[in-house]
Amino acid sequence: MTLTADTLLAGPRGRRLCLEVLRLAPDGPEARDAAWAVSWAAQALDENPGTVVAIAGDASSFTEPEVSPAEAAAALARVAIPELTDALLFTALSLAVDHAAYWQPPSGEDVLAATEDLQPVLERVAAAVAGAPGTSWWGSGVERDTQAMVRWENSPASMEAPEELSARWRSEQVEEEVSFARQIDDVRLSGSWWSTPAFALPRSTRVRGTAGPVGLTLVEDSWGWTSARVRPLAAPDGEVIEIDGPEAWAALCRRHPFPVTASRRNVWGRTTGREGMWMQPDWAAVAGEAAGVHLSVSGYLATAGRVVGLGDLGASTVAGWGPDETFWFSPVEQSAPEQEWVRDGDTWNRV
C-alpha cells in the first residue's frame, strides 16, 4: 500500500502520528498554547484520566480547564508544520507506536485525534507526511538484505524449530479459547490482546544505516530496555506475505480464520468499543504456505488497533506487532556476528 494522507487518517496509530508531528513543533507561543489545549481536551476524553496533583498552593481552589476538541483543533491549526526531517518523522512514529495499548480504552489523545474537529488539522499534516522523502520506505515490503533480530537485555533466543513453535501456538490457542469460554460472561476478565504469530519465532526488522534495526525503537508499549543484542539475519527463501493494510489483513483472516472471541472479547472490546465475534489468522496454517509475514509501516499505521470487518466471520484487528516487523516461519541463518547495543536517553548506540 502506498502511503497517502487517507492511509494515515484511517487508523488510530496514523492519526496519533500526525498529532505527534505537531506536538514536536519548535517551542513558541503557538506550540505552547496547543500543547496546553491538547492536554486538557484529551484529559476530558480519557476514561482513565488520572489525578491532578498540586505541588504547592491551595489545591482546593484549582478548577480543571474545560477545553473542547474544537478549541484544541483551533489551537493546533495555528501551529506551523515543523520541518519534516527524517529524525523528526522517526520520533513521531516511535511515539505513536509506544503509546499503543490494546487491553484498555483508547487514551484521551487517541480519542481526540479521532474527533471530527481535528480532521481538517490532521489532514494537512497527513498530506505533508505522505509526501516527505523520509517516509518513502514506509510502504515498502520486506527488505531481505538488511534484516536483524533484536534480543532484549540478553534474553535467550529460542532453540526450537519454527515449525514446532507454530504447531504449539495453535494447540495453546485452542486451550486458551476453551479456558476463557468457561468464563465468557465475566466482563471484568482480561486476556491475551495480541494477534501475532508465536512470539518465540524469529522476527526481524530492516537495518537503517548506523541507527541499527528499526526494531530497537519501534516497539509498542516498550518496557524501557536499555541494552539489546542485535543479530543480523540472512532471510530465508520463499514467499513473504505482505500486510500492507486492512484489506490484506482481512484476506488473511478469511483464508485462515481462527476464532478468538472468548479470549479477546473484553480486551479488544475495550480498545475498539465493538462487541461481537473476533477472528485472527491461524498462524499454523499460514506457516504452511509462506516463509514469513511482514507488516509494513504504512500497513501498521492504517491497520493497528482498527476494527477490520470480516463480514459473517465478525472482525479482527492488528495488535502487538511492530512496524516493519517480519515473523519467520522458516529457519533463519545468522549472517554476521551478533552486536551489543545500549540506549543513551532516546538513542541506541552500538558498543
Where are these regions (language model features)?
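Aromatic- and glycine-enriched beta-alpha-beta binding-site module
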Residues: 208-238
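N-terminal/edge-of-domain interface segments
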Residues: 178, 184-186, 191-215
